[in-house]
């Protein structure tokens, strides 16, 4: 056991999906995995391990934001030996050619979080995806007939920004979407020498104001789940 994860040694697979919402973790496990076993209920952050097309896969909720995902990613890698981490989450679209429910593969992530400023003594660090995972997910999505968008995302430290126009500066530089975890995931993957990728579904749009319901976000964004799982079995 680690501080925040109740699993015993060997209960978590080397490849894991990381939804922010623990109920999405439950949905993925019950919908896609064979013989899923719940290994974690600590703080309601559900975690499961099962098999997908013969490969052992885990899925673990992480909560929202850089501090929360950092807790789970640190413990999964350090205490349980996880090697491949795929975040499956939602994001707000920031470009006109990106539509609600589109798939986004995050090649890199900007952030306003100070976590890396502290870590690198005021210097910048460029958090990027693992090419192996990025290519596997892109190829999988294309084979399925999807049209994934690939590019940078913005990891925000605050959901309710006091400056509602702040996102426009990032959009001006080609940023595809805003979310709250990827910069931390990619930084920790680099620190520990493991593989990480974020696959996002656009759940709302900062330009058009279109949005989806909480129920849709929990149970209907299955394209990204299928892409993540089918990419995972190629590793």
UniProtKB/Swiss-Prot annotation:
The keyword Glycosyltransferase applies. Pfam families: PNP_UDP_1. It is an enzyme of class 2 (transferase). The active site is at residue 204. The record marks 217 as: Important for catalytic activity. Keywords: Glycosyltransferase, Transferase. Phosphate binds at residues 20, 24, 43, 87-90. Homohexamer; trimer of homodimers. This is Purine nucleoside phosphorylase DeoD-type. It comes from Clostridium perfringens (strain SM101 / Type A). The lineage of its organism: Bacteria, Bacillati, Bacillota, Clostridia, Eubacteriales.
């Amino acid at each position: 056991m680690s501080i925040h994860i109740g699993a015993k040694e060997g209960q978590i697979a080397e490849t894991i999906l990381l939804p922010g919402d623990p109920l999405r973790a439950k949905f993925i496990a019950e919908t896609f995995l064979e013989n899923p076993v719940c290994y974690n209920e600590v703080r309601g952050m559900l975690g499961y391990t099962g098999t997908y097309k013969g490969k052992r896969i885990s899925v673990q909720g992480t909560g929202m934001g850089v501090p929360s995902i950092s807790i789970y990613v640190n413990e999964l890698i350090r205490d349980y030996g996880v090697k491949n981490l795929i975040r499956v989450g939602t994001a707000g679209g920031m470009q006109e050619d990106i539509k609600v429910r589109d798939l986004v593969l995050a090649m890199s992530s900007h952030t306003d979080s100070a976590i890396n400023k502290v870590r690198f003594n005021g210097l910048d660090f460029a958090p990027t995806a693992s090419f192996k995972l990025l290519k596997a997910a892109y190829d999988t999505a294309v084979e399925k007939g999807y049209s994934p968008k690939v590019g940078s995302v913005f990891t925000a430290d605050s959901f309710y920004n006091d400056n509602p126009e702040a996102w426009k500066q990032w959009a001006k530089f080609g940023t595809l979407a805003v979310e709250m975890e990827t910069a931390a995931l990619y930084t920790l993957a680099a620190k520990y020498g493991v593989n990480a990728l974020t696959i996002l579904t656009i759940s709302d749009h900062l330009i058009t104001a279109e949005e989806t319901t909480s129920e849709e976000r929990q149970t209907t964004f299955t394209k990204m789940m299928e892409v993540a799982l089918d990419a995972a079995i190629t590793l």
